[in-house]
A protein has these predicted regions:
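N-terminal pre-Walker A segment at the start of P-loop NTPase domains
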Residues: 33-51
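Short phosphate-coordinating micro-motif centered on Lys-Gly-acidic
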Residues: 37, 129-187
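Hydrophobic anchor at the beta1->P-loop junction of P-loop NTPases
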Residues: 64-66
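P-loop (Walker A) phosphate-binding loop of NTP-binding proteins
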Residues: 69
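Conserved lysine of the Walker
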Residues: 74
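Short beta-strand-centered segment that lines the nucleotide-binding/catalytic pocket of NTP-utilizing
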Residues: 87-102
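Conserved nucleotide-sensing/catalytic segment adjacent to the nucleotide-binding pocket
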Residues: 102-140
């Protein structure tokens, strides 16, 4: 059974006031609990602030699975995230290289674009398994790697509505939930 533990909505009918609404979904006693937080970005600068907040709480071993349609903002979010953690000025989308790596202050940062993969097995050739343990991973089009994607990750669904960009972030453990709650965006 799925029960909504908490939902915050603005009283004038607008969903997700200012920056975030917190939604906790409990999937029963024997199942993993998911925690969701939704962030609203009106400008590219808002997206930059949000990406920087996430990069500030990122830890070695974190995987950010970035879902969204073409043009949703996956590469833009990734660029700001990477620039905040490294000296990289230019952060091109890895559309053709499939992966770009960057030396961060405390760990390596891997930026994947899986759009062109034909099967999950092709991700092995990119060294994806090693990167899961050796750094922070930003994965665009994670649905292309299917079963290779670990369970305990940051799931980021990006979508647009009424000229705003929304980032729906889901985590499934207490430690990530604490980091999500301390993010500092829109507080």
């Amino acid at each position: 059974t799925l029960s909504v533990a908490a939902t915050i909505l603005q009283s004038n009918g607008q969903l997700f006031p200012k920056a975030a609404a917190f939604l906790i979904l409990a999937h029963g006693l024997n199942k993993m609990t998911e925690y969701k937080k939704i962030f609203k970005c009106l400008t590219e600068n808002d997206t930059k602030k949000l990406a920087c907040c996430f990069s500030n709480v990122a830890q070695k071993g974190d995987i950010f699975a970035l879902y969204g349609t073409l043009g949703a903002g996956k590469s833009t979010f990734s660029r700001f995230f990477i620039q905040n953690l490294s000296d990289a000025q230019e952060v091109p989308s890895p559309t053709f290289t499939l992966v770009q790596s960057y030396e961060g202050n405390d760990f390596e940062i891997y930026h994947y674009d899986m759009y062109r993969l034909k099967s999950p097995e092709e991700a092995y050739e990119l060294g994806i398994e090693e990167s899961f343990y050796n750094g922070v991973n930003l994965i665009e089009w994670p649905e292309k790697i299917g079963y290779l994607l670990p369970k305990n990750i940051w799931t980021v669904n990006i979508f647009t509505k009424d000229s705003a960009r929304y980032f729906e972030v889901t985590v499934s453990d207490e430690e990530k939930k604490e980091r999500l709650e301390k993010l500092g965006y829109g507080d």
